[in-house]
Amino acid sequence: MYLLPLLFPLLNLFISCILGKFLGKRVLFVLVINMLFSAIFSFWIFYEVGINKSVCYIDLGPWFHIGLLKLNWLFLFDSITSVMLVLVVFVSLLVHLYSIDYMSGDPHIIRFLGYLSLFTFFMLMLVTSGNFVQLFLGWEGVGLSSYLLINFWYTRIQANKSAMKAIIVNRFGDFGIYFSLLVIFFFFKSFDFGVVFNLVQFLDTQPRMSFLGFSLNRVDLIVIFLFLGAIGKSAQLGLHTWLPDAMEGPTPVSALIHAATMVTAGVFVLIRSSPILEYSSTGLFLVSLIGGLTALFAGTVGLVQYDIKKVIAYSTCSQLGYMFFACGMSNYSVGLFHLFNHGFFKALLFLGAGSVIHALLDEQDMRKMGGLIKLMPLTYVAILVGSLSLTGFPFLTGFYSKEVVLEIAFSKFSINSFFIYWLGVFAAFITSFYSIRLMYLVFFARPNSHARAVNSSHESSSFIFYVLAFLGFLSIFIGFIFKDLFIGLGTDFWANSIFNLYVNSDILYAEFLDYYYKLIPLVFSIVGLFFSLFVYFVIYDYTVFVVKNKFFRYAYFFLAKKWYFDLLYNNIFVFNLLSSFYLLTFKIIDRGLIELFGPLSFVRLINKSSIIFSSFQTGFLYNYIFVVLLGLMFFIKLTSSLFFPSFNSFFNFGLFICLLSLIIFLSFGNKKQNI
């Protein structure tokens, strides 16, 4: 029963590959029904494990055994797993249903849904794994599936580039996971969560190395490597560049990647590894710092984007930053609650954007939209609900988790936490601004689309409408429904699945903060909302002001270039690495060493040898006689050394005379020939 949510998506992959060719589009409903069954069993697991506290371990038997390394197929179903199962499977079900209509005109829709099911399966493999190697299998599978889906329209060169960029950038993060696995096995001789989490407290905490001014112990080393992997997969500052380019895939792919899979994998690994993170103060500080910086960075870049999907993509990057610094503040339950809430309203935003793109004949530039509020009122309501929930508007889903994240940062009462708190507050202001900007450019601005696109604009079909309506309902109420269960004071929902040292637990302080401290993030969000309304609905010539003012013009260029990360990476790392490896592999190895010791060297050796041997062909009899005598002397020398050792000196002298005579006569013969 517990493994059925994993088996149905895997079954979908085989059905789409084997039966899709014969059944045609009739197989689509079979795939959706299988995902429905997977969702039903996921809800049952949530009730059985999360509500009834029946944690389940399933050992399917040995996987491989090499020396000290013995691994079994082990599945762990605890509270964390049950929450992630509901989120991943339910969002995947809605995306499958949405894709039937959205991709109806694509001849490869069956392959597309097969890839979606494969994506879902690997994400479920990741969240249900009972050891780090099995988790790594799901981790790599998610990366592979994202490549297939981003590059689904493989005839488009930009899709090819984006898919390659996603998988290459993630390779750098994956090196962190590789090294963390090596270090974990070196210290614990096991990969099982139970063994590692119970023994980590006994590791030597004395500093063993220093890096960038930080003294690191063994636990710090594990945490930093895990964190590097999480940075890559969750698109945090430094390895974020692949996320906006991933928008080249179909819109349902973007919804699934940003709402429930791929980018949430990094946050999940940090939450799952909470027993390790709690013993590393340095690691926790780095997690919270990078999370806060990412929240601010992604928000500022989202301010100047005009691609509707990229605006939402940068909002995902920003919200993941909130989740990271919640984990860095040792409040993993709050981070997971925000991840859970974020999945629903982010899916709503992407699928709503897909409805707009679908209606405008695949147009994604918001400058070419406008005036759609009368043509698509239901889509407008859906995106409005998603945007307000994203900003943390009171009593919507995002409000119940986003505000708590900031309250916890404030309740730490340290300089580091105050700095990160204000990063999050300013990010909340910016989020409100670009959310209203998106609404204005898409629905309220003067129509700038082609007449044919505007005339064909209409609300989407029933599949898309029901999916948006249901996600809109969840984006309003799901946070209120689960707040007390997930992060309520005294809740025991998480039991032992999340570990907190008592010195790091500050949820109690956040609960009893003064109200004016709690209102600061909300006030900044509302101010950002009204400021955006003022800029876009009152000041119509704001672009002229930006262009004329030198400071704002340079600031705009800086943000439009995405803080120059892509430019720096291309000019400093990519170009120099390509030039260096070109010089090494082509100039030095291929055209250098291989030619020197390979074919060219062999040809030169043959030519020189032929010149030397041709010099013996003089045409004079006495030269040939000396060669025969020389060979005879060598033979006699060899036999005498074996049978007549006393004659060695005599034959050595005779052999020397013959060699000397041969050289003289050869020289004389060559000179005579030249004459």
UniProtKB/Swiss-Prot annotation:
NCBIfam families: NDH_I_L, PRK06590.1. It comes from Acanthamoeba castellanii (Amoeba). It is a multi-pass membrane protein. Its main location: mitochondrion. This is NADH-ubiquinone oxidoreductase chain 5. Belongs to the complex I subunit 5 family. It comes from the Eukaryota. GO terms for molecular function: NADH dehydrogenase (ubiquinone) activity. One of its GO terms (cellular component) is mitochondrial inner membrane.
